[in-house]
Amino acid sequence: MQRWYAPRLNNIYYPYGCYLRVKINNMGLSLDDMEPIFKVIQALYNRAVTKKNDLDDILYDNKENNKNEEILIRKVLESTKAGIISYTKVQKDILMMNFPNNKPSPYMYCNCEGIDCEKNKPILTYVRKPGMIVSYENYGPWVDGINSTNKEEFIIAIFVLNSNNRLSGIDGNDSLEEYVRKSELADHTSWQDFSFRANNPRIISKIQN
């Protein structure tokens, strides 16, 4: 549950309606119960949607490493803003990987490969309006342009779609949210470009680049 709904669990900053409250075996899952990596994911999501870096959360004391960057695309959207990528560099202690907590690597929590013995590859995830994580990537076009870190730190990032934006130059009045939702196909495990109303605007690949 935390892996897929970290942005929305007990999150008062979730901007699209009610946040999620979860019970497992009649026991409520609070924000304090969440694993550190998923607290980081939620904290990054909140920085993307609020544009504030002084939120009282797991990244509060890591301000100098927390960054937001707007992803701009020309010619295919009414507004050039496709979304915001919020990212940070965190030490092992923030993820509680050191003694006495000894939490596992974020690669394990996110079901990512982490086979490099000398460096840590970045982890990036992406999300649209419902607040459900689609996938965690540490290989491929989402992260190929991001440098790896040493073994004592990790780069964690989330791309938050500008769901209220709309496509331009295509018949109809379709939102960016609708286009991306259809790109997930039935398995909801990735975003893929596709031909939409006899046109392929290549929005996903442009976001990745």
Predicted regions and their residues:
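Bergerat-fold GHKL/Histidine-kinase-like ATPase
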Residues: 1-209
